[in-house]
């Protein structure tokens, strides 16, 4: 029986310390090699989503540096579209090379530019939370605020300050129905890059909005809409922990929705890092009754052999 898995890649799978295109392409080639075992036995249909927080923030800065009457800077929704195409191209290249290297040329690869519908009244528009772009020290942050006083910055996990923008919850993926025949044809599909281009519904179609959607919540929505059997959220650690970095820390393996909701109520997961991944996984499990796993790229082999990682069950 063929199993359909939606894989959500963390930012560490694309951008390391070097923001050049070449470095990000090399990082994705490594990522593609690590993901291929999922599909090598022809028993898994894989759909891949990814974030774009660093890339879209960097692109906006480039846009603003060149902003002029004759060459105006693009708005945030358009920048999301640009990075979705950019990273989608890199991912298609990386998967194609990895497939050829592993004698799996039979698997076609496609990257689809997708729009994600959000609610125009989502309270997230009034409370920016999504970090984008580079890190700044305090002096750098103050300098940016002098140039752009309406920007909002937050301290990010002890690594410095980052700009944050609205991150409304996704309600649906416009192109979801068009994706199903591609996936069923054993095409390796990359979709909903950077959470998808944020749009709201209008009488004559859709209108782009200034936001960046969390890629894990978007992945949960994609997984639901394409009827995936599993949602696999990849991050920097093999398991989710409670009492993290404390003497009594404990890794979570198989946990229920009710247990995870209890840990959230205790404040076990950091708002800017593990919490949205856990919440996205819970969203998928509660809507579908199917499992979601949070683990690392490096743990994929063990996930395949032993179902390891933190697996959330109904």
Show which residues each predicted segment covers.
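C-terminal catalytic "cap/lid" subdomain
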Residues: 2-314
């Amino acid at each position: 029986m063929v199993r359909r898995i939606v894989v959500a890649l963390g930012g560490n799978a694309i951008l390391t310390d070097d923001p050049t295109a070449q470095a990000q392409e090399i990082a994705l080639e490594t990522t593609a090699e690590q993901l291929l075992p999922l599909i090598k036995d022809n028993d898994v249909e894989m759909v891949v989503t990814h974030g774009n927080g660093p890339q879209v923030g960097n692109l906006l800065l480039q846009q603003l540096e060149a902003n002029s009457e004759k060459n105006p800077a693009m708005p945030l929704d358009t920048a999301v579209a640009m990075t979705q195409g950019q990273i989608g191209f890199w991912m298609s290249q990386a998967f194609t090379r990895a497939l050829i290297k592993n004698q799996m040329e039979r698997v076609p690869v496609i990257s689809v530019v997708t729009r994600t519908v959000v609610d125009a009244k989502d309270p997230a528009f009034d409370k920016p939370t999504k970090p984008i772009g580079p890190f700044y020290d305090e002096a750098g942050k103050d300098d940016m605020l002098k140039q752009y006083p309406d920007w909002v910055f937050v301290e990010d996990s002890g690594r410095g300050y980052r700009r944050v923008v609205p991150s409304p919850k996704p309600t649906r993926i416009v192109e979801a129905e068009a994706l199903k025949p591609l996936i069923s044809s054993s095409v390796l599909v990359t979709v909903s890059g950077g959470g998808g281009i944020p749009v709201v519904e209008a009488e004559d179609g859709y209108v782009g909005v200034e936001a960046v959607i969390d890629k894990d919540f978007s992945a949960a929505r994609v997984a639901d809409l394409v009827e995936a059997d599993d949602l696999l959220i990849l991050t920097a650690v093999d398991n989710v922990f409670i009492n993290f970095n404390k003497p009594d820390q404990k890794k979570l393996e198989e946990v229920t929705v009710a247990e995870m909701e209890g840990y959230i109520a205790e404040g076990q997961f950091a708002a800017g890092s593990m919490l949205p991944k856990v919440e996205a996984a819970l969203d998928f499990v509660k809507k579908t009754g199917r499992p979601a796993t949070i683990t690392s790229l490096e743990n994929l082999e063990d996930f395949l052999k032993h179902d390891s990682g933190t697996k959330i069950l109904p």
